[in-house]
A protein has these predicted regions:
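Short glycine-/aliphatic-rich beta-strand segments at the starts of folded cytosolic domains
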Residues: 33-48
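A short, structured beta-strand/loop element
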Residues: 64-66
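Non-catalytic propeptide/linker segments at domain boundaries
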Residues: 90-121
Length: 121
């Protein structure tokens, strides 16, 4: 059983993307910025420590992808939250490589993502 429950979610239209970003509690003003970037593969990770979410977001942004995080992530009021990782298959594989260079908790997330990405046909 996996800890972060990575799974693909169906995001085929901008409306789908807006709904999923809103559902995890992102700032409403950020939805229109992030939704167009979601038309690729979108992976939801559950119960991610918010300090890890910030690093995952920074790494994915450096690859040209996006990570939607809860509105108050950078204030660290909550300990964990759900996040949406959005990118092309190539960007997602590159993210796995980047996360695998970090500390053990992020390496574990990288391993779970790698398993999920191997399921893409």
């Amino acid at each position: 059983m996996t800890k972060y429950k990575p799974k693909f979610i169906d995001v085929e239209t901008l409306q789908d993307a807006r709904k999923e970003i809103k559902k995890i509690g992102s700032d409403p003003q950020s939805i229109e910025i992030m939704a167009p970037k979601a038309i690729s593969k979108v992976i939801k990770l559950e119960n991610v420590l918010l300090q890890d979410a910030i690093i995952i977001k920074q790494d994915m942004l450096s690859l040209g992808g996006e990570v939607a995080v809860p509105k108050n992530t950078f204030e660290l009021h909550d300990k964990t939250g759900d996040i949406l990782v959005m990118g092309t298959i190539k960007q997602l594989h590159e993210l796995v490589d980047k996360l695998d260079r970090h500390y053990p908790r992020l390496k574990n997330i990288a391993k779970e993502l790698a398993v999920l990405l191997r399921s893409i046909k």
